[in-house]
Amino acid sequence: MFSTSDQVSKMNSRILSALLILGIATCVIAGGFCPKSRHPQCNLSYKINDCCAQSDCRVGSVCCVEGCGNVCRAESDTPLGEKFVDGSECKHGHVFPKKWYQFWWRV
């Protein structure tokens, strides 16, 4: 037969396990926000995309849209910047604007 202290101990273990799982799930589900952009406007004639998906960034960082391209930034608690939407058109690296003749011919 189980004693009362064994039952209390098992119940406490189950409660702690449930709270731990809930805490981990909350951290995984909560996709952080982008902080305020450091450079909202860009003086370059091209963009530099360091990320084209949220999976391109390390854990604890998000892919954010900035003036000079997409960059991985540390997550913020408040939505101040623009988060990159996975599946949007994006090209890694230096991206130059199309030249006038490229609109008519696919170069």
Swiss-Prot record:
Q: Does the entry annotate any disulfide bonds, and if so which pairs?
A: 34-64, 42-68, 51-63, 52-90, 57-72
What organism does this protein naturally occur in? Answer: Lycosa singoriensis (Wolf spider)
Domain WAP, first and last residues per copy: 31-76
Q: What is this protein called?
A: U20-lycotoxin-Ls1b
Which intervals of the chain form a coiled coil? none
Q: Where in the cell is it found?
A: Secreted
Which keywords appear in this protein's UniProt record, sorted alphabetically?
Answer: Antibiotic, Antimicrobial, Disulfide bond, Secreted, Signal, Toxin
**Predominant location:** secreted
* Signal peptide per UniProt: 1-30
Q: Which InterPro entries match?
A: Elafin-like_sf (IPR036645)
* Tissue-wise expression: Expressed by the venom gland.
The Swiss-Prot or TrEMBL record annotates one GO molecular function as: toxin activity
Biological role stated in the UniProt entry: Has antibacterial activity.
Q: Top-down, what is the taxonomic lineage of the species of origin?
A: Eukaryota, Metazoa, Ecdysozoa, Arthropoda, Chelicerata
Mod. after translation = Contains 5 disulfide bonds.
